[in-house]
C-alpha cells in the first residue's frame, strides 16, 4: 500500500538533485573531490562498475562502515546500492541514515522475478529502466527517481541514449493516444505493453513526461556525453567509472558538472572539454557477450 505523504516527500528529495550530477565514489577522498567539484550527491560503493565488470564474481551491498565514512566526509546527499530484490540490504542501508537507495542492476540480482517493494520504505529509491514500461513498473513499486540503465562500466554512452530515446518514444505514444481520445488503445497499452495501472498511464499522458525525475546513467564519460543526455530530456546524470577511471578526475568532475548545467551552450561544452587528460579507455558495448550485459537484469 502506498503512503501518499511519504511518496510526496521521497519524490521531493529526488527533485532536489535535479539538474545535478551524482558521482560514484569508493572512499572519503573521492567523495571530497566530488563535493568540491559541485556534485549534487555521491553514490558510495566499494568498486566502480568498471571494476565490478572486470573482476567478476558476486557483487553485493558495500561495507556499511565504508558508507558511513563517506557520509561523515561530505555535506551533500549520499546514496548506496542494493541488489535487485534484496529488501534486507535496502533495510540495512536505510538504517544507516543515507539519503537514497539505488536498486541496481550493477550488483548481482538477488531475485530474478521480484523487485523490492519500495512503497514499504521511508527512504527514496532510484531504479534503472530501458523503456517506458520498465520505468512505470518501478514507479508503481515506489521508485522516486528513474535513471537509464545504459551499460555501466563501459564508458560507451550508446545504451543510455537508446534507453532515453525509448522512454521518450513511449511517452509520445501515450500522449498521442490520450490527445486523440483513444482510450481503448491506452487501456490495451497499459495492460499488454506497459503492464501498469491506468492511473499511472493517465498521469504520464497529462504531464507529458514521467511523474518522477529521470536521470541518465551508464557509459557517461565526457562533458559532451552529459550534455547529450540532458538535451535528450534527462533531468540530471549519474557518472560512475567515467571520473575516477580518467586521467584527471578533479578537472573531469568539474567539467561534467559544468556541462550538465550548461548543456545547451556548445561554447561552454567546448571550453570545459579542453585539457582534461585521457578519458577512461572503456569497452565498446558491441564487444560484450550478451550474457554479460548488465542492463538486461531486472525488467
Curated annotation (Swiss-Prot):
Binding site for D-glyceraldehyde 3-phosphate: 165
EC number annotated for this UniProt entry: 4.3.3.6
GO biological process: amino acid metabolic process; pyridoxal phosphate biosynthetic process; pyridoxine biosynthetic process
Keywords for this protein: Lyase, Pyridoxal phosphate, Schiff base
PROSITE patterns assigned: PDXS_SNZ_1, PDXS_SNZ_2
UniProt function note: Catalyzes the formation of pyridoxal 5'-phosphate from ribose 5-phosphate (RBP), glyceraldehyde 3-phosphate (G3P) and ammonia. The ammonia is provided by the PdxT subunit. Can also use ribulose 5-phosphate and dihydroxyacetone phosphate as substrates, resulting from enzyme-catalyzed isomerization of RBP and G3P, respectively.
This protein's name: Pyridoxal 5'-phosphate synthase subunit PdxS
Gene behind this protein: pdxS
Amino acid at each position: 500500500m502506498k503512503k501518499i505523504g511519504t511518496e510526496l516527500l521521497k519524490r521531493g528529495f529526488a527533485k532536489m538533485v535535479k539538474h545535478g550530477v551524482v558521482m560514484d565514489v569508493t572512499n572519503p577522498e573521492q567523495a571530497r573531490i566530488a563535493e568540491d567539484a559541485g556534485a549534487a550527491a555521491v553514490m558510495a560503493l566499494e568498486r566502480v562498475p568498471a571494476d565490478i565488470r572486470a573482476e567478476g564474481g558476486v557483487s553485493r551491498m558495500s561495507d556499511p562502515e565504508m558508507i558511513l565514512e563517506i557520509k561523515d566526509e561530505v555535506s551533500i546527499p549520499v546514496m548506496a546500492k542494493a541488489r535487485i530484490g534484496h529488501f534486507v540490504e535496502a533495510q540495512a542501508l536505510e538504517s544507516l541514515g543515507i539519503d537514497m537507495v539505488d536498486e541496481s542492476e550493477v550488483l548481482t540480482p538477488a531475485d530474478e522475478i521480484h523487485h523490492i517493494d519500495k512503497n514499504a520504505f521511508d527512504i527514496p529509491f532510484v531504479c534503472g529502466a530501458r523503456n517506458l514500461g520498465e520505468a512505470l513498473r518501478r514507479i508503481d513499486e515506489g521508485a522516486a527517481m528513474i535513471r537509464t540503465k545504459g551499460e555501466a562500466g563501459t564508458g560507451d554512452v550508446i545504451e543510455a541514449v537508446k534507453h532515453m530515446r525509448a522512454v521518450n518514444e513511449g511517452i509520445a505514444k501515450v500522449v498521442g493516444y490520450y490527445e486523440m481520445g483513444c482510450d481503448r488503445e491506452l487501456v490495451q497499452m497499459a495492460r499488454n505493453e506497459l503492464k501498469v495501472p491506468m492511473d499511472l498511464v493517465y498521469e504520464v499522458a497529462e504531464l507529458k513526461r514521467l511523474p518522477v525525475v529521470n536521470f541518465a546513467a551508464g557509459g557517461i564519460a565526457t562533458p559532451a556525453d552529459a550534455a547529450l543526455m540532458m538535451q535528450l530530456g534527462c533531468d540530471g546524470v549519474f557518472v560512475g567509472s567515467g571520473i575516477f577511471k580518467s586521467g584527471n578526475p578533479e578537472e573531469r568532475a568539474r567539467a561534467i558538472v559544468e556541462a550538465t548545467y550548461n548543456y545547451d551552450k556548445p561554447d561552454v561544452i567546448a571550453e570545459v572539454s579542453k585539457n582534461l587528460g585521457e578519458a577512461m579507455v572503456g569497452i565498446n558495448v558491441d564487444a560484450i557477450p550478451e550474457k554479460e550485459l548488465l542492463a538486461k537484469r531486472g525488467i
